[in-house]
Amino acid sequence: MESKFKQLSDTEQELEISFSPDEFQPELDKQYKLAQAKAHLKGFRKGKAPLQMIKKMLGRDIQYQVVEELAGKNFESVAKENDLKLVGQAKIRHYELAENEKLSIYLIYEVHPAFELKPFNEYEFKKAEYQVSDETVEKELKKLLQSKGNMVAVEGAAAPTDIVIGDVQKLDADGTAIVGERQENQSFRLEYMKDDSPFFTALNGVNKGEERRVEVEVKEEDVPEENKKQTFLISVKEIKRMELPELTDELVKELSRGKNETVQDFRDELRKQIEAYFTNKSEEDLMESVAQKFLEENVFTAPSSLIKMYEDMLLDNAKRQIGGAFPPGFDETYYRAEIRPNAEKHARWMLIRNKIAELNGIEVSDDDIKALAEKEAKLTGAEATEEFVNTYFSEQYKPYVIDTLLRDKIYEFIKANTKIEVESKLPEAAV
């Protein structure tokens, strides 16, 4: 058996495997005879049809079966001997057969692209250290209390947290009401509007019975220039405000489902949750910056099959977020095209991480897996630690565990070998 490689692109190769007659002909003859023994051909008893007729009628199928078997048996060993870093499965491109002389099988497959990782020890990143204030805790507490509150109509000027209800009339350039462009009883929740929003500016402080004119600039490119500026007249009919209940020990027990007994315990627990959220956010934001920097500095082509794998993952995630399936008529082809750049980034970042691990001897040991299993068992309060360990070492779960641990180790290595500036920051929004 001989093998010959041909580079088709940065990520695609062709392998030609050639066999001598003694390596393929015996198996080919065997399959011809097996087909002859099973054949029911008109004019012949079972198994008595001439071999040449069998070859003429079934030869191509039999040959391809033998080619597939030989390719399957030998490709893995050739790939291992030549240290091929495969992505996905190899495919038979075509084959050339001269019986009793030579068989050549041509396979195409994808490999990890060859690239030199740029030095990164001088990379600089900023990491936010969020300061959770009493004010932040109170804001989140208020959000939780809203589930037990009641909306009540109020007199006086609308506060920045109120809901303004009114009729909206669209006006033309001359200020005249446009027929058919009136919407009644529209709700404007000021709390969720930006401070510089035209609607917030107009309605904050408004009173029941007053009118406010709002000018909005449409930014969509497909809107004609003459329609870029739109004017609305809002007639305020009612102002509603959330009336919150008093936070008591009894309400705390209900909100926490019995986990907390007192108001102070509840506040302390809420602060811990907010701090944990922002600690995690800080880490995720840093890792996003790290990935972006490495992608900018290391430009190469990712294998198409790897990109498709991430496309499929992003597609499945999108489906899960809307109940498991896209609505009828959804253009999946268009959506794939939209998410492909993101999938390509995921693929390239995975290859960069693997390169970092390879160059720096970063590996995951069985002790690492066992330690994680024991840690998770302890966190969940599970008594059967051994069951956790067995699950983490199972054939189904182990690859996922290794990938998670390896990714974490690589991140820690990057953080230890780059410059990270910690900056104090106030939370913009909490959990």
UniProtKB/Swiss-Prot annotation:
The compartments listed are:
Cytoplasm
| Record-annotated PPIase FKBP-type domain positions | 161-245
Q: Which reaction does it catalyse?
A: [protein]-peptidylproline (omega=180) = [protein]-peptidylproline (omega=0)
A GO biological process of this protein is: chaperone-mediated protein folding
InterPro entries, sorted: PPIase_dom_sf (IPR046357), Trig_fac (IPR005215), Trigger_fac_C (IPR008880), Trigger_fac_C_sf (IPR037041), Trigger_fac_ribosome-bd_bac (IPR008881), Trigger_fac_ribosome-bd_sf (IPR036611), Trigger_fact/SurA_dom_sf (IPR027304)
Could you name the Gene Ontology cellular component terms for this entry? cytoplasm
Any single Pfam family the record assigns to this protein: Trigger_N
This entry's Enzyme Commission designation comes to 5.2.1.8
Annotated keywords:
Cell cycle, Cell division, Chaperone, Cytoplasm, Isomerase, Rotamase
Keyword check for Ion transport, yes or no. no
Top-level class of the enzyme under EC nomenclature: isomerase
Q: Which GO terms describe its molecular function?
A: peptidyl-prolyl cis-trans isomerase activity; protein folding chaperone; ribosome binding
Q: Which Gene3D superfamilies match?
A: 3.10.50.40, Trigger factor ribosome-binding domain, Trigger factor, C-terminal domain
Task: Give the UniProt family note.
Answer: Belongs to the FKBP-type PPIase family. Tig subfamily.
Q: What is known of its domains?
A: Consists of 3 domains; the N-terminus binds the ribosome, the middle domain has PPIase activity, while the C-terminus has intrinsic chaperone activity on its own.
Q: What does this protein do?
A: Involved in protein export. Acts as a chaperone by maintaining the newly synthesized protein in an open conformation. Functions as a peptidyl-prolyl cis-trans isomerase.
Q: What is this protein called?
A: Trigger factor
Q: Which organism is it from?
A: Chloroherpeton thalassium (strain ATCC 35110 / GB-78)
